[in-house]
Swiss-Prot record:
Family: Belongs to the choline monooxygenase family.
CDD domains found in the cross-reference section: RHO_alpha_C_CMO-like (cd08883), Rieske_RO_Alpha_CMO (cd03541)
PROSITE patterns reported for this sequence: RIESKE (PS51296)
Binding positions ([2Fe-2S] cluster): 138, 140, 157, 160
Subcellular location, record wording: Plastid, Chloroplast stroma
Function statement: Catalyzes the first step of the osmoprotectant glycine betaine synthesis.
Gene3D superfamilies: Naphthalene 1,2-dioxygenase Alpha Subunit, Chain A, domain 1, Rieske [2Fe-2S] iron-sulphur domain
Transit peptide: 1-47
Entries under InterPro entries matching the protein: Rieske_2Fe-2S, Rieske_2Fe-2S_sf, Ring_hydroxy_dOase_asu_C_dom, Rng_hydr_dOase-A
Source taxon at top rank: Eukaryota
Catalytic reaction annotation: choline + 2 reduced [2Fe-2S]-[ferredoxin] + O2 + 2 H(+) = betaine aldehyde hydrate + 2 oxidized [2Fe-2S]-[ferredoxin] + H2O
Name listed for the protein in its UniProt record: Choline monooxygenase, chloroplastic
Length: 422
């Protein structure tokens, strides 16, 4: 029998999910009186939003209505370009985001780059072993500074040769002799807050507390990013030593939230859309636990073990969603993570990274077969998500309803509303 468990959740949620106060930032910097202003600039100073229009879209979903009587957010949340731009500022730039893995910066001078919304970043480990994160933008004329990943002793801009140390300081500015009121010390890279928890490297787009930035403590990250779910995730082996295997990327013609919704339907779609996966799971054991900004779905393994003994799912599976766009899947000897990156109101990229028990890291046949099965499931989800996006564009659809098993999805929408409300 399917069960739903409820752990600690924020005060603003409806009664069926209601619990503690004070977990979220107040975002007071976004405060605005709609009666006094028709427009207001938010986090990104280059972007202006019509407050009245955004406010109307946000209030079309009411988080105080319990799931049993609630409607889903309107289709405009998934299609409107203005809503999408506002969403980037309010949802993605205020909290921790998992953007990479500690193995990517294992040694001094290692670095990797990425993009979150319209923010390009670079993460590196300097010569003294300290981890830094910066906006990946040259201070001279805004060229993107680094690309890809690898190892460098410094960052040299390909445009005009300005050179930065791995600690972000500008150490060389070409052809600046004679320029007045210019100081190398004032033109370093703009820092970002960076943290490491288990195998994950996390960023906050909000400005670092000091010019050089600081690596946050494990305790702070656990509190802000994972809340009270950290114990259950550790128990499930999420932070255990695993070997990194590979990365797969899927570009999908759907809003980023469509992919998240699909993940958060409590296994509802599995019997209908994933016949192969279903045979390896015992859906009668499916359960859901809701935390502050995390929901965990768990399911026992089924009877699918090949005649050759092949079994990638094991005896139980744990699927954790970390708001707003990160999934951690722990099953058998495997862990894979899914980072959902918005590319526009109707497009996203999902980055899958695969980790494996070290005892199996050299078993090429097992790895190949496991990845093939995983890819089959992902392509089934791609088809579903793109189909949903087309339906959301239809004049025939505006809002839907929740099934009882879709509590994680409803929780996700309540969290979105909390970040988006004016």
């Amino acid at each position: 029998m399917m069960t739903t468990l409820t752990a600690t959740v924020p005060e603003f949620l409806p009664p069926s999910l209601k619990s503690t106060r004070g977990y979220f930032n107040s975002h007071s910097e976004f405060g605005v009186s709609i009666s006094k202003f028709s427009r207001r600039r938010f986090h990104n100073p280059t972007r202006v939003f019509a407050v009245s229009d955004i406010s109307k879209l946000v209030t079309e979903f009411d988080p105080k209505i319990p799931l049993e009587r609630a409607s889903t957010p309107p289709s405009s949340w998934y299609t409107d370009p203005q809503f999408y731009s506002f969403e980037l500022d309010r949802v993605f730039y205020g909290g921790w985001q998992a953007v990479g893995y500690s193995d990517q910066i294992k040694e001094s001078r290692d670095f990797f780059t990425g993009r979150l919304g319209d923010v390009d970043f670079v993460v590196c480990r300097d010569e003294n072993g300290k981890i830094h994160a910066f906006h990946n933008v040259c201070s001279h004329h805004a060229s993107i500074l680094a690309s890809g990943n690898g190892r460098k002793s410094c960052f040299v801009c390909l445009y005009h040769g300005w050179t930065y140390s791995l600690s972000g300081s500008l150490v060389k500015a070409t052809r600046m002799s004679g320029i007045q009121n210019f100081s190398l010390s004032e033109m370093g890279l703009k820092p970002l807050r960076v943290a490491v928890w288990g195998p994950f490297v996390l960023l906050k787009v909000t400005a670092a507390t000091s010019r050089k930035g600081e690596v946050e403590t494990d305790e702070l990250v656990a509190s802000e990013w994972l809340g009270t779910s950290v114990g259950r995730l550790s128990q499930g082996g999420v932070d255990s030593p695993l070997s990194y295997i590979c990365r797969r990327e899927y570009t999908i013609d759907c809003n980023w939230k469509v992919f998240c919704d699909n993940y958060l339907d409590g296994g509802y779609h599995v019997p209908y859309a994933h016949k192969g996966l279903m045979s390896g799971l015992d859906l009668e054991t499916y359960s859901t636990t809701i935390f502050e900004k995390v929901s965990i779905q768990e399911c026992g393994g089924g009877s699918k073990v090949g005649e050759d003994g092949f079994d990638r799912l094991g005896s139980e599976a744990l699927y954790a969603f970390v708001y707003p766009n990160f999934m951690i899947n722990r099953y058998g000897p495997w862990m894979d993570t899914n980072l959902v990156l918005p590319l526009g109101p109707r497009k996203c990229k999902v980055v899958f990274d695969y980790f494996l028990d070290p005892s199996l890291k050299d078993d090429e046949a097992f790895i190949k077969r496991s990845l093939e099965e995983s890819d089959r499931v992902q392509m089934e989800d791609v088809m579903l998500c793109e189909s949903v996006q087309r339906g959301l564009e239809s004049q025939a659809y505006d809002k839907g309803r929740y099934a009882l098993v879709e509590k994680p999805m409803h929780h996700f929408h309540c969290l979105l509303h909390h970040n988006l409300k004016l």
